[in-house]
């Protein structure tokens, strides 16, 4: 396959049709064997062509006229994907015309000289002659300036060649060789070549054994599997990573595809636990041990352990870092708006605080990008001058030089004084919201994109530890600053938990939406639902327009019938949200209206699920799964839409009710609530319901999930509450972050 440089004769483009194992893997031409004398003549003629591109094959017909450069009528065979032939050192190339086809002539193209005396410079090419024809396999030109540094993926023809190779070298039976095609296809479906990454050989083989076990296939041994890998992903290199006595062989240049189900295996959990140890950076903190009042650093086995961890997991970390968005940077922090300085401080102290906190946030972003979550606690301890009153083990983790530098720039006494000022509190809260939003977008850049289970679990464990780490590090800081900081980090942790759960639901629902039989069953069950009855029951609570509800029902069924992808469903949900909130755009009541929309959406979908349950729908499980996904994704959309409307970050929106004082009845925005209530009254007046029905006694107070027991007792009689919600009534809680994050409220009627 070669294109003439001059391009004087534009050849027709013909798609190369690859064959299955029993067919020839060459274009439909009459390929004849070429005598040795004619081979040399053809080699010299080919050398006059100035460009031989990497991994190209030129077919030379024995009966055709050999054209000189510029006179060749070129026919190209474009591949639909990267399917390339390249040299494999020490390997053989076989023609796939039949099992008896053997390579009869292999002529190296190193340092070949053309008829004009021009050095060809083809690196690593070979001229192969078999019973079916002559093939010129080249890698690159020396004067091209580009060397072949990437591994190449085999074409379907190479799959057949690999099967024949294994059959001849290992003496595989016909039955076993017929199974190799499925094994090789599985490799192509789940792995891909990439620079700078590697996988342990044992991990690949364990994936393969699991695949064989699930599909009841007979696996080949490890040695034969290694040949399979190299025959498909040609040019792979092997590296031994790890310390002496604890190293393992890795395939370098291959990784699991991002959308492969192998990413969801739990076997990498142990690796991710190790991954959270310090590595790939200079050690910012050294463990210090106090012995007779003298702090001596560990210089023995502790450093060796760190080195072992670093060398063992450095290659694996690159695989998980590809799912992050490391291009994100911290937003610009605003200036501190302060009218009067606290006693004992100067403007230079405020500037020092701004500079130190910026560096502190950049360090946090740095360790998150490298998945070194455990270092966050040490960063907080250093910035807030953590000093445990009673060390339990006689050991404290700190870095004296770093602390002394920070102390010289801003003494702790002045830091504590500044933390009491309201302007500093507000400024630091805004900085935290911007930083945490950037961290969320780094760790989970796309909530619908598949994420490995190991990375998901590591993020959830990280979120679970955040509040405890921060509270412990700020043990000597004023309480008002602690509340402000904890409220922001709580919103960050809750967002990480929600987004990882949403991502997990998305991957589970993706399989359902791609299953034709399940979609047909869902359509059949959905057509049996009495939507008129559902609307009649939901109208009293939701107050939704009948035409809009009917339109949503029709659109939902149509989208389901079209077997839309998950991304198309996401676009549909976004359009529904935009249409529902459009009347409230630009109004102060927009956030409240958005929360009301979430409640109505959840209530209406629960009514549909109830109808499916009562009818014992066969597809109830599928509907329940996508209902959970759509509710979570709608929450995600509303959260971002409210943030856009208010000019804040989603983290700031979620942190609005992070403080108990902020959600107390006395501190709620009464004006906003009154405006929404007046709008709801107008909707009630315009409705067609009888006046008597609308005048029924109502309890207008809604109680969040997990609200305080005393508030319930004073607000409404417990007997009026639905017993099914009693599990959400808890005694005094520290925060109601769960309530504000999920947006779930219940109205006692």
UniProtKB/Swiss-Prot annotation:
A cellular component term, taken from the record's GO annotations: chromatin
Source organism, top-level taxon? Eukaryota
The molecular function terms of the Gene Ontology recorded here are: DNA binding; DNA-binding transcription factor activity; DNA-binding transcription factor activity, RNA polymerase II-specific; RNA polymerase II cis-regulatory region sequence-specific DNA binding; sequence-specific double-stranded DNA binding; transcription cis-regulatory region binding
What the entry lists under InterPro entries is as follows: DNA-bd_RFX, RFX-like, RFX1_trans_act, WH-like_DNA-bd_sf, WH_DNA-bd_sf
Where does this protein bind DNA? Answer: 183-258
Bias (Acidic residues) occurs at 674-688
UniProt keyword terms in alphabetical order: Developmental protein, Differentiation, DNA-binding, Nucleus, Repressor, Transcription, Transcription regulation
Keyword hit for Transferase: no
Q: Which residues form a coiled coil?
A: none
Instruction: Give the start-end ranges of region Disordered.
Output: 663-699
Signal sequence bounds: none
Main location group: nucleus
User: Which is one Pfam family of this protein?
Assistant: RFX_DNA_binding
Xref: SUPFAM superfamilies: Winged helix' DNA-binding domain
Per the record's keyword annotation, is Transcription regulation included, yes or no? yes
UniProt cross-references to Gene3D superfamilies, sorted A to Z: Winged helix-like DNA-binding domain superfamily/Winged helix DNA-binding domain
What are the subcellular locations of this protein? Nucleus
Q: Please describe what this protein does.
A: Transcription factor required for ciliogenesis and islet cell differentiation during endocrine pancreas development. Essential for the differentiation of nodal monocilia and left-right asymmetry specification during embryogenesis. Required for the biogenesis of motile cilia by governing growth and beating efficiency of motile cells. Also required for ciliated ependymal cell differentiation. Regulates the expression of genes involved in ciliary assembly (DYNC2LI1, FOXJ1 and BBS4) and genes involved in ciliary motility (DNAH11, DNAH9 and DNAH5).
Q: Which family does it belong to?
A: Belongs to the RFX family.
Record note on quaternary structure: Heterodimer; heterodimerizes with RFX1 and RFX2, and RFX6.
Q: What is this protein called?
A: Transcription factor RFX3
User: Which species?
Assistant: Homo sapiens (Human)
Q: What is the lineage of its organism?
A: Eukaryota, Metazoa, Chordata, Craniata, Vertebrata
Q: Which gene encodes it?
A: RFX3
């Amino acid at each position: 396959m070669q294109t003439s440089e001059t391009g004087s004769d534009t050849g027709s483009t013909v798609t190369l049709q690859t064959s299955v194992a029993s067919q020839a893997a060459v274009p439909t031409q009459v390929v004849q064997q070429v005598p040795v004398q004619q081979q040399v003549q053809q080699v010299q003629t080919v050398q006059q062509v100035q460009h031989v591109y990497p991994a190209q094959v030129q077919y030379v017909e024995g009966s055709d006229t050999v054209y000189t450069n510029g006179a060749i009528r070129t026919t190209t065979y474009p591949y639909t994907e990267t399917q390339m032939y390249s040299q494999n050192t020490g390997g053989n190339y076989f023609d796939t015309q039949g099992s008896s086809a053997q390579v009869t002539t292999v002529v190296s193209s190193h340092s070949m000289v053309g008829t004009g005396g021009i050095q060809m410079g083809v690196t690593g090419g070979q001229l192969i002659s078999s019973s079916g024809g002559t093939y010129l396999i080249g890698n690159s030109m020396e004067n091209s300036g580009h060397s072949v540094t990437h591994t190449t993926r085999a074409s379907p023809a190479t799959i057949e060649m690999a099967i024949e190779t294994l059959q001849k070298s290992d003496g595989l039976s016909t039955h076993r060789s017929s199974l190799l095609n499925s094994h090789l296809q599985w490799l192509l479906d789940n792995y891909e070549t990439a620079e700078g990454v590697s996988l342990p050989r044992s991990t690949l083989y364990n994936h393969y054994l699991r695949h064989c076990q699930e599909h009841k296939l007979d696996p080949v041994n490890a040695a034969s599997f290694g040949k399979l890998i190299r025959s498909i992903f040609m040019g792979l290199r092997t590296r031994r990573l790890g310390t002496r006595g604890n190293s393992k062989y890795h395939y370098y240049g291959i990784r699991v595809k991002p959308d492969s189900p192998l990413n969801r295996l739990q076997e990498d959990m142990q690796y991710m636990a190790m991954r959270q140890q310090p590595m790939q950076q200079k050690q910012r903190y050294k463990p210090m041990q106090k012995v007779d009042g003298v702090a001596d650093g560990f210089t023995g086995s502790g450093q060796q352990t760190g080195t072992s961890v670093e060398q063992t997991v450095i290659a694996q970390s690159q695989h998980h870092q590809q799912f992050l968005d490391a291009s994100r940077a911290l937003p610009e922090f605003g200036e501190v708006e302060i009218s009067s300085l606290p006693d004992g401080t100067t403007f230079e102290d405020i500037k020092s605080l701004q500079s130190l906190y910026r560096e502190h946030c950049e360090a946090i972003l740095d360790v998150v990008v490298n998945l070194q979550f455990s270092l966050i606690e040490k960063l907080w301890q250093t910035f807030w001058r953590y000093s445990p009153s009673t060390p339990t083990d006689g050991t404290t983790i700190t870095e004296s030089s770093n602390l002394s530098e920070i102390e010289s720039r801003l003494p702790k006494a002045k830091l504590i004084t500044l933390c009491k000022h309201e302007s500093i509190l507000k400024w630091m809260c805004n900085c935290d919201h911007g930083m945490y939003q950037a961290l969320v977008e780094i760790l989970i850049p796309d909530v619908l994109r598949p994420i490995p289970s190991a990375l998901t679990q590591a993020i959830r464990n990280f979120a679970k530890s955040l509040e405890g780490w921060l509270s412990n590090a700020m043990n000597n800081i004023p309480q008002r600053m602690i509340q402000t900081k904890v409220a922001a980090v709580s919103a960050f942790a809750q967002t990480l938990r929600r987004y990882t759960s949403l991502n997990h639901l998305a991957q589970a629902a993706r399989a359902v939406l791609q299953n034709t039989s399940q979609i047909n069953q869902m359509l059949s069950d959905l057509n049996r639902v009495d939507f008129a009855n559902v609307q009649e029951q939901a109208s009293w609570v939701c107050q939704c327009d009948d035409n809009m509800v009917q339109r949503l029902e029709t659109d939902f069924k149509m989208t389901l019938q079209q077997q839309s992808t998950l991304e198309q469903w996401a676009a549909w949900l976004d359009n529904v949200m935009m249409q529902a909130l459009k009347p409230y755009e630009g109004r102060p009541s927009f956030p409240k209206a958005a929360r009301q929309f979430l409640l109505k959406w959840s209530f209406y979908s629960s009514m549909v699920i109830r109808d499916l349950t009562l009818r014992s729908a066969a597809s109830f499980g599928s509907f329940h799964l996508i209902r959970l996904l759509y509710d979570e994704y709608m929450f995600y959309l509303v959260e971002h839409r409210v943030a856009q409307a208010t000019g804040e970050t989603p983290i700031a929106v979620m942190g609005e009710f992070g403080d108990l004082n902020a959600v107390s009845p006395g501190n709620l925005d009464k004006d906003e609530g009154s405006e929404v209530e007046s709008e709801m009254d107008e909707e009630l007046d315009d409705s067609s319901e009888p006046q008597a029905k609308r005048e029924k006694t109502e309890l207008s107070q809604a109680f969040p999930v997990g609200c305080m027991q005393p508030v319930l007792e004073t607000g409404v009689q417990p007997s009026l509450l639905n017993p099914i919600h009693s599990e959400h009534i808890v005694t005094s809680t520290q925060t109601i972050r769960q309530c504000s994050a999920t947006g779930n409220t219940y109205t006692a009627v």
